[in-house]
Regions:
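Acidic, Ser/Thr/Pro
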Residues: 1-156
Length: 156
């Protein structure tokens, strides 16, 4: 079966690591989407000045291979990954971690899992791409950097 990825951004979408610097994305096509993926274009993010670069997460030893890049609606409700996939950080009780088999903090693509209930998206609908700590306003004071991505949706 042929892959059915369609690019849904015109210019790269950039998001930061602190101070509500989400990346805003205006959807280019109405339809039902079974998943989305982000393709790294440029930049990196740090959750600590002493840790190495990451595209999707934090390389601090306490995080391991967990990911922290989240797509939300304008109400900041998690769409991808779905809220039920998010894990709680035991240090602060906030949910913003998740795992995707085969995807690490410097993978060139972040492909979210296929949804059992596809998303219904409308042309010109705004979605937001967040760095997890910034999304839940926790431990972001020493975060830095910005990542720019292309966004693809799998329409059904």
């Amino acid at each position: 079966m042929a892959e059915n990825w369609q690019k849904v951004n015109t210019d790269p979408v950039c998001f930061g690591a602190r101070d509500d610097t989400y990346g805003a994305l205006s959807i280019t096509k109405t339809g039902r989407v079974k998943t989305m993926k982000l393709v790294h274009r440029s930049g990196s993010i740090h959750c600590n000045p002493n840790d190495v670069d990451s595209y999707w997460s934090c390389t601090h030893s306490g995080v391991g291979n967990k990911l922290m890049t989240i797509i939300t609606n304008t109400n900041k409700d998690a769409l991808l990954p779905p809220t039920g996939d998010l894990e709680t950080n035991p240090g602060n009780g906030k949910k913003y971690f998740y795992s995707l088999k085969g995807t690490g903090h410097k993978s060139p693509e972040l492909v979210f899992r296929t949804l059992s209930n596809p998303l219904s998206l409308s042309r010109n609908q705004e979605l937001q791409i967040w760095y997890g700590q910034d999304w839940v306003d926790v431990s972001e004071g020493n975060n830095s950097g910005q990542v720019c991505v292309d966004v693809f949706a799998w329409y059904i």
